[in-house]
C-alpha cells in the first residue's frame, strides 16, 4: 500500500510551478494546460523540481493526436528544434532548446510522442503504454505526472533492461546509488500490487513474482548477478517490443558508443539546431572582452549543442604554410623592424612601404584565415554554431583584414612582392560572411586598465592598445547584421546581452525533419 506520509509530498496536486521556473518553461507548461493537450512528465519525477528550474532536461510525453498543436506551442514558447548530428535520434522523440535570458543558459525540452526506452544508448524497445501514463489525475509542482504505480512499474522495466549488455552495465553502474534512492521514493508512494498488475499488462508472460524479483534486485546495489538475471528474463519476454533486430541493436549500440567517445574527446555535443547553425563573429578593440565573452558563450551554448570557438586573428597553419610560418618568430628576432606591431604604427602605415618578409607573412596569414573561415562556414551549414574571436572586415587596413590597398599596390614595382600583395587582396575577396557580427565596445581608458591586469608574456602595453584602436574599430561588414554591446557593464550583464543576441540569429525549424 501507499505510504500516506510520502505520497502527498511527492504527488502534491495543489502545488504550483517553482517561483524560479524559467520563463520559457513556464510559458510552455501554462500553454499546454490552457490548451488541454494531454501530456505528463513521464520519468525521473524525483528530480522534477530541478528540471523545472532548468537544471535538468524536461521529459514530456505528449498525446500524438495533439502533435501539431504541441509544435506550435513549443515554438511560441521560444524553443528551437534540434537534431542529432550523427543520426543518433530516436523515433517519435525530439529535442528543443530555449534561452533563459535571465540566467543566460539554454533550457532543454526532451519531448516524446511514444515510449521508446530500455537501454540508455539505443532505446531499442517500443512500449505502447502511453495511455497508461497519460491517463492520470496526478500532478507534482503543477505538472501532470503518471500515477505512482505506473511510474514504479516503468522504472523497474527500464532499469531491468539496462542490465542486458556489457556497455549498459558500465553506464548504469555510474552513480548507482541514485537508482536505489529513486526506487525507494517510488516504492513509498505506490501501491505495489497495482504496480505489479500494470507490469504484467506491459510484459508478456510475466507475473507479480517476476516484478518483485526485479524490484528487489534493482534495490540492492550488491545484487549485480540478480539484476543481470532479471534483465535477461525481462528482455526475453519483451523481445516482441524490439524496434530493431538483436544484431542491429548490438551494432548500433557500439556505433553510438564510439560516437560518444569521439564527441567527448573533441569536447563537443551531438545536438545541432535543426534549421542550420550560424557563424557569430565577436569583434572589437583589444581588451573589450572578445576572448572572455566568446568562451562564456561557447560554454553556455556548448553544454547542449555543437559549438566551436575559433580565433580568426590567429588561424592555425595549413600544410602549405606550416614550415614558413614556423620560421616567422626567428625572423622577427633577427629583424626587429619586421614585427607586426611596427607596421601598426600610424607613420609606418602612412608610408605604404612594406618589406618582402612582411608581405609574405600577411599573404600566408590571409591564406590560413580563408581556409579556417571556409571550414567555419561548412560547419555552420551542417548545423554547428561557430563563435569566432575577430573576423575580417571589408575595410582595407582594418585589423584581420586585407593590409594592402590599391595605392600600395600601384607604388610597388612588378615582381614577387607585388604578386604576393595581389594574392593577399584576392584571398580576402569573396570570404564567407558571418551570420551576425557582435561589436564589443569599451572606452580606450578602460581597455588600457584591463590590459594592465592581463597576464601576458610581454606584459601590459598601453601604447599597443591605443595604437590598434582605430584599426580594430573602423571595420565595415557590408550587409551583415551588426549588433553593438557595451562591455563596460559587468561580465554577467555582458554575457546575458551576448547570449540573447546570439540565440536570436539561430533559425527556428517549424517541425522535425
Where are the regions a protein language model picked out?
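Conserved NTP-donor binding/palm subdomain of two-metal-ion nucleotidyltransferases/polymerases, i.e.
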Residues: 2-56, 62-278
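P-loop (Walker A) phosphate-binding loop of NTP-binding proteins
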Residues: 284-285
